[in-house]
């Protein structure tokens, strides 16, 4: 077993989810590649006296289900999984697929059925507000190809950023959080960009390995109607 996998599993259980004895955790595995990590998460869950529940899916199987998906089907699936999710204290979701565009040809209306009738009740209404959750991807050849590098090189990069000391990072973020929370006006200046806005009384939220791995940001939002200026994007954007 790769020691880096053991470290990641330990951090997910102890730091991200802070699992305690008797708590129940839903471990969602998408793809076969994350299995070594999922097995280690199960072991670590048992070590703390918590109870693991595992559900596994692949993009290719989900594609076949979605191509013929009906509202009745998605409602029943949601009803079953809502009952399970309501009993969970935590959720760990790991995705690792070979083909990142496996579901590219699934009709939009089928995706919409899943989003409305399954994802919304199970995840948005129960999992997100009522469990300790963390989600991440597992390194695969598809991800390495997207990064234009070898799998080994990508794995090194992946574990270096996923196995950071996020507790230490969170402590270091406090100074930025304090600064942002007492700031009113913000101005961003770069090539072809000069934009200003207010963040007064908008909370600054730090993200340090609690819900996403890898992680590392402090975010806020501008006060509505306070934005003025010009911004230029270096990549295509819907907006």
Regions found by a protein language model. Give the residues of each.
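Active-site bordering "gate/hinge" segments
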Residues: 1-230, 235-239
């Amino acid at each position: 077993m790769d020691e880096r996998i053991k470290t990641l599993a330990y951090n997910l259980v102890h730091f991200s989810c802070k699992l305690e004895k008797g708590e129940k955790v839903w471990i969602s595995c998408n793809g076969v590649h994350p299995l070594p990590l999922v097995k280690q998460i199960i072991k670590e869950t048992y070590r703390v006296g918590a109870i693991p529940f595992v559900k596994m899916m692949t993009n290719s199987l989900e594609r076949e289900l979605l191509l013929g998906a009906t509202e009745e089907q998605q409602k029943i699936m949601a009803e079953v999984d809502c009952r399970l999710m309501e009993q969970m204290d935590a959720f760990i979701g790991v995705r690792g697929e070979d083909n990142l565009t496996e579901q590219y040809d699934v009709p939009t209306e089928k995706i919409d059925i899943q989003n409305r009738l399954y994802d919304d009740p199970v995840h948005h209404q129960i999992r997100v507000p009522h469990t300790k959750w963390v989600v991440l991807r597992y390194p695969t050849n598809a991800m390495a190809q997207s990064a234009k590098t070898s799998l080994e090189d990508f794995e090194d990069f992946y574990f270096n950023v996923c196995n950071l000391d996020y507790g230490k990072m969170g402590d270091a973020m406090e100074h930025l959080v304090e600064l942002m929370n007492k700031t009113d006006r913000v101005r961003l200046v770069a090539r072809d960009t000069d934009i200003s806005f207010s963040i007064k009384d908008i909370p600054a939220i730090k993200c340090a390995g609690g819900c996403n791995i890898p992680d590392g940001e402090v975010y806020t939002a501008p006060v509505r109607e306070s934005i003025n200026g010009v911004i230029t994007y270096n990549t295509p954007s819907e907006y």
